[in-house]
């Protein structure tokens, strides 16, 4: 995914999948920021302990935002995102490409109800990832990034998002990692398979509006992004 002519985002990704009434989560592998505008691989070990889920939620909560996309003055999409890094006076938000695609105005709403306008830094269709930027002075918190390779089957995971619109902003759902290394065929046109993604399986409930929100481990670290819902 190209960030623009100022830098490149290197983003190995997989998707996690739960087929049924739950959802699909796009998961970053070994990511962290190097402070130079890139996301790079990081192999630090994450020790997961069953501490209070409330503590983990509190750690990530204010970094999660509502993303409202509009075109010609009409709202066309609502999703979720999270602040993942800052540099100088700019803060960067990760969300899904399909949340902001075809929009000409993007409104960001923080957990305290304040809002600001975001600009698109880069986006990529296949991974369904978009990077937005806002003024650093507007944000409330920055998420801590974990390592999805360290998550084990049965580990507790949770999501924070905006299911069914901003009325339910900040909704938390909890589940476990149900499986690893699933392969899912993805079609952009609906007729043919365009590519195959390696996925993790989770039973954490994901609904429309959660797209772009974080999948989080028990330490309050982001290990993935909710990408789309399969039923």
Residue ranges: model-predicted function:
Residues 73-75, 85-167:
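Conserved active-site neighborhood of the chymotrypsin/trypsin-like protease fold
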